Amino acid sequence: MTTLRKLPIALAVAAGVLSTQAMAVDFHGYARSGIGWTGSGGEQQCFKTTGAQSKYRLGNECETYAELKLGQELWKEGDKSFYLDTNVAYSVSQRDDWESTDPAFREANVQGKNLIESLPGSTMWAGKRFYQRHDVHMIDFYYWDISGPGAGLEAIDLGFGKLSVAATRNSEAGGSSAWINNQRKDADKTINDVYDIRLAGLETNPGGSLEFGVDYGRANTQDDYSLAPNASKDGVLLTAEHTQSMMGGFNKFVVQYATDSMTSWNSGHSQGTSVNNNGHMLRVIDHGAINLAEKWDMMYVALYQDTDWDNNNGTTWYSVGVRPMYKWTPIMSTLLEAGYDNVKSQRTGDRNGQYKLTLAQQWQAGDSIWSRPAIRVFATYANWDEKWGYNNVDKSPDNGLAQNGTIGTDSRGKSNEVTFGAQFEAWW
């Protein structure tokens, strides 16, 4: 009987412990979804200039997308701790009630803080991770992003700044081959490793700081496998970024230079098996978000990127845009986004241009331009004139090369369109 009396107490204690542990799980993420129409008929179209690496996103997103993050501090003793972080991402076309998709397992890592006595404040980590990503939110453009499986040690306090070192990996389809038993065998995948060194928090002026980074990427073939003779093999990405606190927000000025394998994505990912990316890239970005007045906030971006490839298939991309926000109440606002992209083909010398305007009425959880969740209704107008595109004829020797006109290319020609709809966006 004594044992039976103790059993409910034990179960209650166990339930309490499990409940406490469950409550300690951190749930973070990002999501957006909505519905839209095109003025000429059909579902919402989205508009991106051929040759540009991004588009102005307000009222110009045509998919349902979500990142669901679960994490928990697994152990803590004094200032030492271990934290598990995971992230699964989904993307569907938002055409149907039931839309199945294969999720992307984006993150699964453990971060250990203050594990090295001689390096207080540092974090040791290993696993798949979004690693110190730098982006321009209004065009959804990640200009410094080496995310992937990896390991590193970050935030090493040097007194004048903080040092971080990491190694990450991604892969390319095919890319290398070998002769085995007198037969050619092509690899299904060839991995690329990236080695990253960053020095951040260098104070330059009141409210201002510098960050420098060096990324070296190279293709890493299996034993007995080799790359094509003219493959780029490796490359570097150099980054300098100045961040200035100003007008209730911030401004970031970025200069980047990349070579060879690091010029395909221009973000820190390497494609060393490619024979088409020998050359260099120069990029300059100025972007930020500021408070203009009591009822006015604004995001802005100006970007220049010149990719000069030996095969003359590079581009010069200019982009400039603003997104002012007028706050009628602490939870209701009107936004206007105006953006212009222009991309010149290195091969043809012609240009593709597009300007896009979006007017949105928004209800959001707060009075900042960053406040989310938000529900918005929008109308978008886009006008484009494209003189060139990339050859998209299967098995053509010129497939993937820039050429004039719309026949046999992905050029959109010259046209304009109107779309309208509603969308929610949230992060937490």
Swiss-Prot record:
Induction entry: By maltose.
In terms of one coarse class, where is the protein primarily found? membrane
The residues annotated as site (Greasy slide, important in sugar transport) are Y30, Y65, W98, F250, W370, W427
Q: Where is the site Important in sugar transport?
A: Y142
Q: Which CDD domains match?
A: Maltoporin-like (cd01346)
> Does Membrane appear among the keywords?
yes
Q: Name one GO biological process term.
A: monoatomic ion transport
Q: Which GO terms describe its cellular component?
A: cell outer membrane; pore complex
Q: What quaternary arrangement does the UniProt entry report?
A: Homotrimer formed of three 18-stranded antiparallel beta-barrels, containing three independent channels.
Q: Which family does it belong to?
A: Belongs to the porin LamB (TC 1.B.3) family.
The name this protein goes by in its record = Maltoporin
- Write the gene name: lamB
